[in-house]
């Protein structure tokens, strides 16, 4: 009887906690703040300063994305900084950790920060990560790890993805650090984009802005330092690094960074708040103001989940310019929440004067890019959703260059050709290479059900 009594009270306590956790996780982030325009003012002030000498190239495919990361790490002589939303101990993830281990072995300081929720889900028991963290010159932290007493903090995630070498070169974009985005370790992979930036590192340069931002994230009080542990995985890291050098020796040995990149007029970083808390939509506000500078805007995003404020911003933009969105068709998308929300909200989006290219290409589009006029390109981690606007840390890089803009517009043509264009006037057009894909009935039923069930938590999506 005593045991049953204890179990009964444990069950009650668990039920009370779950009620508390769900209630606070859903309702604490509900009040959405308003932007002050501060980020936009900072951006405008940087435009008036002397432009730093920076060069850029886009990275479009998964093999190049992994190789450029390995090259960047191998080039480091002083320090490597690595920030990512989702690192896993799979093929490409182990390649990256082996390269970081190799850098640390030759005396390079290595700092790694991973989102705490994904770190818990995928790396908490990773011997590879522990072996890397055990190296003398390496420090690994989880951003805002799970806090059972404050469950609402689960909503505030580190969504930045960048890699910096020696404060002079970096890769930044939308790719996570696993086989879905890097290398060719698996067949089904997402479509995404990074940019490589080579800089003189001068005051006011985008790399100096990124370094300042990183330090603010790195020093957040909630972060948890991961304890290293030497094990058989230490030898495995050494062996993997040696194998990488053997396979990619020529590519890793010497890179002419100037030849591999193109000069641009200006590069500037737009960043949201680094704190794990509900955020004012300063980054969204800055992006809207940027889009207002062009008469032709192409917004590439995996999905669209907007509140009334964001819808109104899009509507105001569409009144005086062509505003097109390039996103996944429901039958092509990989995010159930995004797909189900689009099923319900499609007509609302179109009614705002926005035309939508619905991509059907067999691979999920994960690219976050805004092409404005013929000279502005914005690339980074920001999705056109409330999570990016109000909850997560996000980065977008603004590149002023007609050459880069033209190249990225040309890159988008292959996906436009495989799209169904939903016009705001109710019409539909089809790309030259569009092929209809049937959405399985089970998925359609799931998405339809989710579109109703997730209404109470749309602000968290």
Question: Which residue ranges define each predicted feature?
Answer:
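Lumenal/extracellular "mature" regions of secretory-pathway glycan-modifying transferases
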Residues: 141-143
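Charged, low-complexity intrinsically disordered terminal segments
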Residues: 2-138, 148-158, 165, 169-461
């Amino acid at each position: 009887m005593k045991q049953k009594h204890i179990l009964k009270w444990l069950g009650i306590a668990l039920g009370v906690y779950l009620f508390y956790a769900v209630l606070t996780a859903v309702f604490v982030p509900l009040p959405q703040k308003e932007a002050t325009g501060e980020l936009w003012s900072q951006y405008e002030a940087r435009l008036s300063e002397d432009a730093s000498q920076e060069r850029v190239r886009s990275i479009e495919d998964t093999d190049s994305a992994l190789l450029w990361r390995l090259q960047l790490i191998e080039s480091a002589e002083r320090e490597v900084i690595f920030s990512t939303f989702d690192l896993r101990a799979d093929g490409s993830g182990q390649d990256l950790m082996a390269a970081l281990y190799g850098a640390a072995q030759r005396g390079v300081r290595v700092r790694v920060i991973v989102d705490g929720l994904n770190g818990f889900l995928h790396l908490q028991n990773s011997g590879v990560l522990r072996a890397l963290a055990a190296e003398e010159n390496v420090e690994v932290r989880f951003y805002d790890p799970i806090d059972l007493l404050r469950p609402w903090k689960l909503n505030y995630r580190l969504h930045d993805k960048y890699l910096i070498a020696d404060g002079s070169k970096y890769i930044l974009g939308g790719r996570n650090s696993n086989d879905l985005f890097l290398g060719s370790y698996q067949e089904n992979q997402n479509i995404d984009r990074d940019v490589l930036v080579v800089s003189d590192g001068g005051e006011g340069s985008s790399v100096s802005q990124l370094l300042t931002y990183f330090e603010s994230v790195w020093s957040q009080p909630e972060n948890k330092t991961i304890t290293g542990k030497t094990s058989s995985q230490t030898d495995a890291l050494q062996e993997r690094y040696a194998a990488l050098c053997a396979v990619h020796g020529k590519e890793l040995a010497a890179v002419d960074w100037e030849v591999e990149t193109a000069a641009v007029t200006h590069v500037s970083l737009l960043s949201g708040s680094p704190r794990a808390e509900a955020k004012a939509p300063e980054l969204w506000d800055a992006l809207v103001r940027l889009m207002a500078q062009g008469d032709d805007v192409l917004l590439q995003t995996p999905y669209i989940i907007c509140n009334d404020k964001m819808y109104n911003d899009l509507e105001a933009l569409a009144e005086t310019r062509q505003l097109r969105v390039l996103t996944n068709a429901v039958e092509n998308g990989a995010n159930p929440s995004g797909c189900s929300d689009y099923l319900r909200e499609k007509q609302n989006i179109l009614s705002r004067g926005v035309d939508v290219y619905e991509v059907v290409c067999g691979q999920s589009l994960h690219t976050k890019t805004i092409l404005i006029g013929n000279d502005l390109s914005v690339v980074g981690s920001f999705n056109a959703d409330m999570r990016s606007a109000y909850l997560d840390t996000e980065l977008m890089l603004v590149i002023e260059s007609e050459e880069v803009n033209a190249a990225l517009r040309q890159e988008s043509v292959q996906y436009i050709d495989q799209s169904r264009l939903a016009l705001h006037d109710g019409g539909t057009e089809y790309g030259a290479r569009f092929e209809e894909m049937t959405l399985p009935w089970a998925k359609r039923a799931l998405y339809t059900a989710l579109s109703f069930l997730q209404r109470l938590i749309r602000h968290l999506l």
